[in-house]
Amino acid sequence: MAISSERVEELLRTFRESLKAKGFEIYPFKVGWYNAVLTAAHHLQYPADTLAVLVISTPAMFECAFLPFLQSQSCESLRDPIDQCTAHTLSACISLCFANQFVDVSYDYEMLPSRKPKFLAQTAAHVSGAAYYYQTSDIHNPPWGEKKMFGVCVHPQLGGWFAIRALLVFRDVQAGAGFQQRDPADCVCTQEERIRLLESFNLRWRDWSYRDIVPAEDRYSDQQKQYFITPPGQRRALLRQWGYLTDTQS
């Protein structure tokens, strides 16, 4: 049985509030909206009206979830600490809020046996209304010709200072006709800005200038920047230097 948009919001309210306190945001959408813009090879294998939820992390996640997680939990040495924190936080909130629901969770880093990602994160961000996915197709006369340029999502309040973390699918929840799709905010409006965005993301991504393509209400703290600028293989040493990991967790 399909549920109304009001019931969707009621279902997600406590979950939304719990994750917000940890520095995450959620954006619900129908599986059919996602499948409609992709080839069959990338479809999510659920009925079109099935409720899905995209989870993103905001700058607050680092201080509100990640650092407390490091203080209270043992990090597995072979897994990325941020990924562990995200999985731990989502698992706890799902268990608390959806004890009687079947929720399938896919993380942004997970791959299928075919080596395709479990879901296309930026497409999900766009169809859910979380962030506009800017691609070469959004530019009338690309100055780089046939050169491959990857697209990037921009959040209307956070610019590029966020990350897509997970996709939840509520296997037995169908959203009704009243649950309408919301277009993402087109906050990079001019062709010149879009060109600058894609060039910054593809050619100068290390300087992070693409993240400031629009004014952001919040940005990563200096400590968070230092963590993400550090090469992945050296981040555990940095966490030990900060006092968050013991030698047995290295």
UniProtKB/Swiss-Prot annotation:
One of its GO terms (cellular component) is cytosol. Substrate binds at residues 108, 119-122, 133-135, 153, 164. One of its GO terms (molecular function) is transferase activity. Its EC number is 2.5.1.151, 1.16.1.6. Its cofactor is FAD; FMN. Can utilize both FAD and FMN. Its main location: cytoplasm. It is found in: Cytoplasm, Cytosol. CDD domains: MMACHC-like (cd12959). It holds the Pfam family MMACHC. It catalyses: 2 cob(II)alamin-[cyanocobalamin reductase] + 2 hydrogen cyanide + NADP(+) = 2 cyanocob(III)alamin + 2 apo-[cyanocobalamin reductase] + NADPH + H(+); apo-[alkylcobalamin reductase] + an R-cob(III)alamin + glutathione = cob(I)alamin-[alkylcobalamin reductase] + an S-substituted glutathione + H(+); apo-[alkylcobalamin reductase] + methylcob(III)alamin + glutathione = S-methyl glutathione + cob(I)alamin-[alkylcobalamin reductase] + H(+); apo-[alkylcobalamin reductase] + adenosylcob(III)alamin + glutathione = S-adenosylglutathione + cob(I)alamin-[alkylcobalamin reductase] + H(+). GO terms for biological process: cobalamin metabolic process; embryonic viscerocranium morphogenesis; regulation of chondrocyte development. Keywords: Cobalamin, Cobalt, Cytoplasm, FAD, Flavoprotein, FMN, NADP, Oxidoreductase, Phosphoprotein, Transferase. InterPro entries: MMACHC (IPR032037). PANTHER family: CYANOCOBALAMIN REDUCTASE _ ALKYLCOBALAMIN DEALKYLASE, METHYLMALONIC ACIDURIA AND HOMOCYSTINURIA TYPE C PROTEIN. Monomer in the absence of bound substrate. Homodimer; dimerization is triggered by binding to FMN or adenosylcobalamin. Heterodimer with MMADHC. Belongs to the MMACHC family. Cobalamin (vitamin B12) cytosolic chaperone that catalyzes the reductive decyanation of cyanocob(III)alamin (cyanocobalamin, CNCbl) to yield cob(II)alamin and cyanide, using FAD or FMN as cofactors and NADPH as cosubstrate. Cyanocobalamin constitutes the inactive form of vitamin B12 introduced from the diet, and is converted into the active cofactors methylcobalamin (MeCbl) involved in methionine biosynthesis, and 5'-deoxyadenosylcobalamin (AdoCbl) involved in the TCA cycle. This is Cyanocobalamin reductase / alkylcobalamin dealkylase. It comes from Danio rerio.
